[in-house]
């Protein structure tokens, strides 16, 4: 609930209780957390290693406060996952958080600025989405769930053709 409190990789099962479809990994935040610079650098290395090594990684959800825009660390993360996005090895969903604090014009502007930033790493093959999101008023929650479900579905092996 409190931003910046995640200090480990936390895994959550998605899907039915007795037969999870996938795991959701919550990685430590690196912008807001009130911890030492050394800890933040250690987290960055953990995240970079995780994003680089996990071949089963289907996608990355990057949460950005649209009032602040993409931070330098966000841009570094995008550069890091860029090659995997370009060859469609992973997908990206950027959630512009705290959308309840934006009026319509500011929300539209934030979406356009995010799209402009993401255009720098986007290719025809990449699967990149961006949406306004608010946990408070549930804006974007259903759309995000649809995207995550589609990621899980894309991991399932194709059904054998009928004989």
Model-derived segments and spans:
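Active-site glycine-centered loops adjacent to acidic/histidine catalytic or metal-binding residues
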Residues: 26, 97, 134
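Canonical P-loop GTPase G-domain recognition
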Residues: 101-163
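Adenine-nucleotide cofactor-binding loop residues
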Residues: 3, 28, 136
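Conserved C-terminal guanine-recognition region of P-loop GTPase G domains, centered on the G4
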Residues: 44-128
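Flexible beta-alpha connector loops of hexameric P-loop NTPases
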Residues: 30-41, 100-103
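Residue-level recognition of specific faces of alpha-helices
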Residues: 8-11, 26, 60, 129
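Short, basic/glycine-rich phosphate-binding loops at helix/coil junctions
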Residues: 20-32, 56-58
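Switch I (effector-binding) loop of TRAFAC-class P-loop GTPase G-domains
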Residues: 1-20, 49
């Amino acid at each position: 609930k409190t931003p910046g409190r995640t200090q480990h990789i936390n895994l959550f099962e998605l899907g039915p209780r007795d037969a999870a479809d996938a795991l959701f990994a919550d990685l430590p935040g690196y912008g807001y957390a009130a911890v030492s610079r050394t800890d933040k650098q250690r987290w960055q290395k953990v995240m970079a290693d995780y994003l680089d090594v996990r071949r089963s990684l289907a996608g990355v959800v990057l949460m950005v406060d649209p009032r602040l825009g993409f931070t330098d660390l966000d841009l570094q993360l995008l550069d890091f996952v860029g090659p995997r996005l370009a060859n469609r090895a992973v997908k990206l969903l950027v959630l512009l958080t705290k959308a309840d604090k934006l009026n319509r014009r500011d929300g539209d502007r934030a979406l356009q600025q995010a799209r402009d930033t993401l255009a720098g790493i986007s290719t025809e093959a990449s699967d990149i989405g961006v949406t306004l999101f608010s946990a408070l008023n549930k804006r974007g929650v259903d759309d995000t769930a649809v995207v995550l479900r589609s990621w899980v579905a894309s991991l399932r092996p194709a059904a054998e053709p009928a004989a």
